[in-house]
């Protein structure tokens, strides 16, 4: 929350002053609609990308490093503002091509184990792999704390871990 109100960059502004304009949606739902097609970016972007876009364009500040404490902290803070909102990620219109690419990757068998995301997150959700209960693959709970990481990690860190695990 402190980082949310911290003035940074050449424009002398904080994320709290510029974020809704950059995100193109109200703060109370932003965590439930990203990733989404972003008009100014002209493509589908993640919440982390819109945070850095705001920092660079509206604040004149340096972007946060992807897995930095600041990025994870501000992402968690912003997602908390959407707690209770129904997940409503648009997969039609200008977002449809990105959705179809993601869907193809989700079902594509990869690696030495010849597995897809669906093998765990559809066929085995609710079961355990070692000490981890498999989810349905929803990402709206990220960033999240994992004991294995001894800290908070992003969706993208989890993706990297899954891909590494299937070799």
Q: Over which residues does each language-model region extend?
A:
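Long compositionally biased, domain-poor regions of proteins
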Residues: 1-2, 135, 161-164
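Short, intrinsically disordered, charge-biased short linear motifs at domain edges
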Residues: 2-7, 99-108
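Short, compositionally biased low-complexity segments
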Residues: 17-28, 44-52, 127-134
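Short, flexible helix-coil linker/hinge segments at the edges of structured domains or between repeats
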Residues: 29-33, 40-43, 134-140
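Post-cleavage N-terminal segment of exported redox proteins
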Residues: 34-103, 126, 148-167
């Amino acid at each position: 929350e402190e980082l949310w109100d911290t003035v940074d960059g050449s424009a002398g502004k904080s994320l709290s002053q510029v974020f809704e304009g950059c995100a193109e949606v109200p703060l109370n739902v932003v965590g439930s609609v990203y990733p989404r097609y972003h008009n100014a970016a002209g493509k589908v972007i993640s919440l982390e990308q819109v945070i850095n876009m705001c920092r660079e364009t509206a604040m004149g500040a340096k972007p946060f490093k992807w897995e930095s404490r600041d990025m994870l902290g501000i992402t968690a803070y912003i997602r908390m503002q959407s707690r209770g909102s129904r997940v409503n990620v648009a997969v039609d219109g200008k977002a449809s091509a990105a959705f179809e690419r993601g869907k193809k990757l989700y079902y594509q068998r990869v690696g030495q184990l010849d597995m897809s995301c669906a093998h765990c997150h559809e066929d085995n959700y609710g079961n355990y792999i070692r000490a981890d209960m498999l989810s349905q693959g929803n990402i709206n709970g990220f960033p999240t704390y994992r004991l294995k990481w001894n800290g908070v990690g992003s969706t993208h860190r989890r993706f990297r871990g899954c891909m590494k695990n299937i070799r």
